[in-house]
Amino acid sequence: MPVFNAGKHLRLAVLSIINQSFKNWELIIYDDGSTDQSLESLADIKDLRILIVNDGQNRGLAVRLNETIDMARGRYFARMDQDDISYPERFTKQLTLLKNDLTLDVVAVSAITISESNEAMGLLPCPVTHESICAKPWQGFCFAHPTWMGKTEWFRRFRYAIPGPYFCEDQELLLRSFATSRFGGIPDILFAYRIKEKRNLPRVIKTRWTFLVIQCRYFIHALKVIDCILSIMVFAALVSRDVWWELIINTNSQRPNISAKMIIERAKWVRLINSIFLVSNTKLNEEHISNVPLLK
């Protein structure tokens, strides 16, 4: 879990890992030069499975991810962002899938999206098969990065590109590896993905442009000119939509998804976040945390 100025959300993210039904894990929290004293919110959490690393430098997400991959001691490596929430069964279900299908390298899960104030907003479904995940590489991969769990050896073989592409490290890695890897997805909602309430349009466009350049280089090298053209068309359509939303729609007034499935998932989310808040408001010490031996 790379951390940079995580603010108020870091504690809940860490507690959601402590709350996992699968207990044999290690959590590496790598602070990337935070200036907001993010780690202070974890001061009372005494858990031998948690390692906090802070070298005082700001080197970027891709560098920190590669460093944690090298430090990891388990057979499997899981991603987690500093402001998201993992559901209690996330690790258990991902490990079960990976162990039942040894051909899989990385698996992701479906998620709900949540606001800065922890309100459930919408659904982020994950395709189940490798073929559906990778059906349209020119369109990108619907495979939420912070929900990944995969073989540690896979992450070490492919690694994140350095310097990291602007806010699209995950898409670059998937594009570079999908032809010789196998991905899988779990349709169950096992994650809460936090979205910013105010979009940073210049950053969004720069991210899309960066990935377009990566795509075109990849497709041209692979002699897939049509895919390159399709990537350009997708880029144009997405940027047009981004600008339209910025100019016409007041995104802060958007209402949450109210589909039947969302109503059910929102009820589950309310129960989960309330249980995490209950733990968060309790002073944590060795008596509240079950210290399990670290992975070997």
Where does each model-flagged region fall?
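Acidic helix N-cap motif at the loop->helix transition within catalytic regions
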Residues: H9-R11, S34-D44, I85, E89
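Short, acidic, metal-binding catalytic loop of nucleotide-sugar glycosyltransferases
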Residues: L15-N24
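A conserved acidic beta->alpha catalytic loop
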Residues: K23, D31-E40, Q57-R59, D81
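Glycine-rich, basic loop-to-helix element that forms the pyrophosphate-binding segment
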Residues: N54-A72, K93
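Conserved nucleotide-sugar donor-binding catalytic segment
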Residues: D70, Y87, V109, L123, ...
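Short aromatic/hydrophobic "clamp" motif used to bind/position activated sugar donors
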Residues: F77
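Conserved donor NDP-sugar-binding/catalytic core segment of glycosyltransferases
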Residues: E89-M121
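Membrane-interface aromatic/basic loop that binds lipid-linked glycans or pyrophosphate carriers
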Residues: Q215-K296
